[in-house]
Amino acid sequence: MPDDFNLKSFLADLPHLPGVYRHLDAAGEAMYVGKARDLKKRVSSYFQKNLASPRIAQMVAKVASVDVTVTRSEAEALLLENNLIKSLRPRYNILFRDDKSYPYLLITGHAWPRIAYYRGATSKRGQYFGPYPNSWAVRETIQILQKVFRLRTCEDTVFANRSRPCLLHQIGRCSAPCVGVIEAEDYAHDVQRAVRFLNGEAREVMDEIEARMLQASTELRFEEAAVLRDQMGSLSKVLHQQTMENVGGDDTDVIAVASAGGKICVNLAMVRGGRHLGDKPFFPTHAEGEQPAQVLEAFVAQHYADGAMPPVLVCSHALPDSGLVGLLAEQGGTRVARVLTRPQGVRRSWLEQAQKNAEMALARALTESGARAGRTLALAEALDLDTDEESLDALRIECFDISHTAGEATQASCVVFLHHDMQPSLYRRYNIVGITPGDDYAAMRQVLTRRFGKVTDGEAPMPGLVLIDGGKGQVEVARQVFVELGLDIQSLVGVAKGEGRKVGLETLVFADGRPPVALGKESAALMLIAQVRDEAHRFAITGMRARRAKTRNVSRLEEIEGIGARRRQRLLARFGGLSGVSSASIEDLASVEGISQELAVRIYDALHG
């Protein structure tokens, strides 16, 4: 520790209050962030002789100073701790990928509610069900609701402009409220039954439909009875196919931890409305040598800090901090009925299945991780890079590609490979402007100057390897940019396509004068290079197409005489995009504010001519 940091005096002055502490290294970087009910007791515990965790002991040996922040409550400390962990990403904290974009099923607050797949903040008017572990689980549930309750899924703009029932009505998946085939009261009843189904009352809904069917039949309303019969048949089929369990109606998260080969998997299974919706595995970083219970606690703290916690948690291990769940529930304004580590009945089978799935996911990850690390090693050996384990894990590869269509909507892409895997959150797109259309060399010069100018300014990291999708010409442009910026050209490598553009025949072109190298189609190093190059190409093309489509959509409407920015916006908002405008009738177009019958005819002719 530095001479100006008196540990003994510092510990003596710490208060017996809740708060957050940060262990800092000699450079002032946060190595570890934690919360405490009692700062004095918690921080002092790190400086005892016998620490249980070798990893934490290693961290304490590097501590140069400690920062503390006193909070008004332990709940406030928990919130601050989570925010600091997310922003600082300390290297000795167990870290989980910040994934808050879980999908929900939304039943809108429309007069004729629609069911929809939804991601994002749950702030729109309507009822939200979830979260679901993946998009597949949401879409499967929507299909069930379509089959059984025939609720609409169309956008409001489409709903407002239908003149006849759509195909979904013809195949029995929608009751066509858009054209008045079903009464508002009957549709509202279907929505209510769908909500009850999602809340786990499937059996009760089934009994209610059966009673209504028998009543309709008794009263000789045979068409209504037939509809209810079909509805009951569809629901019966769903109940037979799905695992619908009566466990008191409480939504449940099942969390199991598995460890092997120095790696840990936390598997989260979600049960909503009595339906097991599937699993989602998480693989934390900085968890080497940690006990499963500690990893589980870190997951619970980070996962539920900003998200809703269900009433029941079923866990494979007891949480070391027994008060954590209560703090999270208090912070989120939710009621957690209980945390179970030795569940009975169906919850026990859920936990056993979650544990098996955690072990299977971990086995797959270990196999894939070994293969990925092997490819990184092969590439490092082929290019004479450092091959120790730490250097390989830290090897950052960036690949640049240019994409356009005959010079239109030129975009450059930069994709990043790090920690033996692609890192989509680090990808970037660059709109290329001020060049001659189709001049790929000028486009490459512009993107490299913009990206690596930030390196020279100290605002961005320098990758260990820079791949250029192109041959000698593109590499020469890149070399010139690096020389101008004072950067090492040894990290520049071009990937030149082989004869017939066949995969496996690529040649590596070096900016520093080394002779070109053909690794061969069986090379693990070339497989990795091809993966990164192809990902850059894919990312560039999707961005270019989106930009081109946006430009064309706007320009096609603006080219029509009488259509300015305001009318264009009204048309696009009313019909949900250019395709909706194109499919609208003249009468539909004329119903938009500011669009006369004459202008509607002109728009229709321009889009269909």
Swiss-Prot record:
Localization: Cytoplasm
Which part of the chain is the UVR domain? Answer: 203-238
Gene Ontology molecular functions: DNA binding; excinuclease ABC activity
Q: Where is the GIY-YIG domain?
A: 16-94
Which GO biological process entries does UniProt record here? nucleotide-excision repair; SOS response
The superkingdom of the source organism is Bacteria
UniProt cross-references to Pfam families, sorted A to Z: GIY-YIG (PF01541), HHH_5 (PF14520), UVR (PF02151), UvrC_RNaseH (PF22920), UvrC_RNaseH_dom (PF08459)
Where the protein is mainly located, per its record? Answer: cytoplasm
Is the keyword Transport assigned to this protein?
Answer: no
GO cellular component terms, A-Z: cytoplasm; excinuclease repair complex
| Alphabetical keyword list | Cytoplasm, DNA damage, DNA excision, DNA repair, Excision nuclease, SOS response
Glycosyltransferase as UniProt keyword: no
**Job description of the protein:** The UvrABC repair system catalyzes the recognition and processing of DNA lesions. UvrC both incises the 5' and 3' sides of the lesion. The N-terminal half is responsible for the 3' incision and the C-terminal half is responsible for the 5' incision.
* Similarity comment: Belongs to the UvrC family.
Which HAMAP family does this one have? UvrC
Matching entries from NCBIfam families are given as: PRK00558.1-5, uvrC
Q: How does it assemble?
A: Interacts with UvrB in an incision complex.
Specify the protein name. UvrABC system protein C
Upper lineage is:
Bacteria, Pseudomonadati, Pseudomonadota, Betaproteobacteria, Burkholderiales
